[in-house]
Amino acid sequence: MLPRWLRGLWWGGLLAGVAGPVLAQAAPPAPLAPTLALHTCRLKDVEVDARCGVLRRPLDPARPQGVQIDLHVAVLPAVARRRQPDPVVFIAGGPGQSAISLAGPISQLMTRELNRRDVILVDQRGTGQSAPLRCDDDQPTRTLAETMDPAGEQRVLQACRARLQKLPYGDLRQFTTPIAMADLDAVRQALGVARWNVVGASYGTRAALEYQRQFPARVRRMVLDGVAPADMVLPQSFATGAQAALEAVFDDCAQDANCHATYPNARAQWQALLGSLPRKVTVAHPFTGQPETFTLSRAMLASLVLPPLYAPLTASALPLAVLQASQGRFEALVGLGMGAMGGGRGLGLATGMHFSVICAEDVPRMKPGGEATLTDFGDFQERLYREACRDWPRGALPPAFYTVPPARAPVLLLSGAVDPATPPVHAERVAQALGPKAVHIVVPNSGHGVMNLGCLRDVVFRFLDEPDDAKAQAQVGADAACAAKMPRPPALLPLLPPTAASASQGGAR
């Protein structure tokens, strides 16, 4: 799974399991056209039967007769007998998340779309059951020092990389986004689909943009939620995005009467807490309850604060957690951070695939001494990724991968105004590059991933369902007006009266 100091940096969801072997072996001559036989299957948390199948693809596109891998595909069938010919294909985030494992949440998210359109889920190569590149390092009851120790995680990654490279499909250069999107179009062909509606979330937006770059004629509509274009350099962007999201927490608290009365010096307490590190702390483990003493560093603190910022609901607990930490009580902060990371069990990401993508597509473009060093979060993520990617095999990329050509089909881009991972500035750049076919909606008081919030589900449905392209674009603005009323959750207040809760205003001690 993804190392613990990186969990929470990438979009995740509720996880389901899908069984099935993955084969990788010398293959017979490839057929002239891909074939994909579907059979009835049951997916966890999906109420109706789905249809599942496997499409064989070459591991190395340059060697079509060489080692083959199996791409696992699931189709959630439309309810109506007369279904629309253009299904929805959902591209999961990460990088490293299985789309099929999210079948339950996706079926709930796209309930209206499923009335008349199939929803297609493909486990991208390296994820789920499609030549999985997983690292078996999930031990929820590890000590806190082990859980947040970057050096220890680097050793785990090195061992995992060595193991993965021994797999029959262990050429880690063959898991880049451009290759994966060629796989996706092979699935489209095998299903006999002329055009489809492409929906991507977080890293899935990068993949969707790459799919459109390679196969523009095959896209009917596109929805991008939490936009992470190829030129974003993911490890470097998090510090500035997280800083802006944290400042928004403090600003909102200062403007809210109850929050300000309870936490009048929240920002100062945070700064004092940072200034007190590194320091030895004693914390009860959130899962075992056993007290543990370890040295808390700024990097560890940042890794705990970042995950709650993804959702304003969890971020609303940060003023209380910071107050208690400034008083020497770190249980709330540790519990909040680890809970947002997946409860110590990760977010279901295939670590090997994650690094095969980031090490090839992002790390070579990282520049030292960037804006991250000026933030409270620092450049620890950059340094960790540089070290992890130092010996990781890197796939080749076409120069055009980092470009966004004008869109031929309507594109809806969605951003959360306080998203620490994919702030709206990136979607705005992409919208300008896509041209007049693109519409960008920024949802106030929202974090990473907004498509499932309130009226946004209906906005997406109407955008996809409208037969006329011009009308689909024109009505989005009016439909999305409901998003302007999205409230920010109020700050979590302690059980004690404000005067007692805020008695310690002098910072860390």
Where are these regions (language model features)?
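Long, low-complexity segments enriched in small/aliphatic residues
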Residues: 322, 327-367
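Helix-loop "lid/cap" segments that line or gate small-molecule binding pockets
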Residues: 307-308, 360
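N-terminal signal peptide c-region/cleavage motif recognized by signal peptidases
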Residues: 19-21
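Gly/Pro-rich cap/lid or specificity-loop segments adjacent to the active site
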Residues: 27-300, 356-509
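Short helix-capping/linker segments at secondary-structure and domain boundaries
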Residues: 309-327, 364-369, 397, 468
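Bacterial N-terminal signal peptides that target proteins for export
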Residues: 1-13
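Structural motif
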Residues: 285-303, 310-314, 344-352
